[in-house]
C-alpha cells in the first residue's frame, strides 16, 4: 500500500477524510482533512495538520471525534504499514485546538497537530 493510501485508510477509520488538496465540491460535513506530506528513512519527524469539520451547535460530536483520533494514535503512537516500511504517527503539541467559523457559528473545527515519521526506504 502506498504512503498516501495508508494515510487515507487510517484517517478514514476515524471519519470520512480527504487530503487537504482533494476535498470534493460536494463533500458534506462532518469530515476531516489532512496534509499529505511524505518523507523517508532518516528524514525525521514531519508535521501533519488534521482539521476536523462539523456542522453542529454542540461540542459533543467534535470532542468525541478528537478523542477517537487520540485513542487510535495512542500514547506511544501508531505504526501504519505501507510500501517499504511503516509510517509512525504520533500526537503533536499542542494536540487539538477548538475553532469556530466567523461567518457561521454552527461550523466547528478542530485543528490537530500530528507528527509522522516515515520509517520507509523511499
Predicted regions and their residues:
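Charged, amphipathic alpha-helical segments and their flanking helix caps
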Residues: 1-18, 26, 33-122
Amino acid at each position: 500500500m502506498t504512503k498516501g493510501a495508508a494515510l487515507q485508510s487510517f484517517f478514514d477509520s476515524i471519519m470520512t477524510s480527504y487530503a487537504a488538496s482533494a476535498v470534493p465540491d460536494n463533500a458534506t460535513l462532518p469530515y476531516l482533512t489532512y496534509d499529505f506530506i511524505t518523507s523517508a528513512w532518516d528524514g525525521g519527524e514531519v508535521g501533519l495538520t488534521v482539521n476536523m469539520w462539523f456542522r453542529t451547535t454542540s461540542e459533543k460530536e467534535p470532542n468525541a471525534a478528537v478523542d477517537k483520533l487520540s485513542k487510535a494514535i495512542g500514547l506511544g503512537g501508531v505504526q501504519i504499514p505501507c510500501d517499504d516500511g511503516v509510517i509512525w504517527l504520533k500526537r503533536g503539541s499542542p494536540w487539538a485546538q477548538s475553532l469556530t467559523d466567523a461567518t457561521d457559528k454552527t461550523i466547528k473545527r478542530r485543528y490537530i497537530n500530528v507528527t509522522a515519521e516515515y520509517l520507509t526506504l523511499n
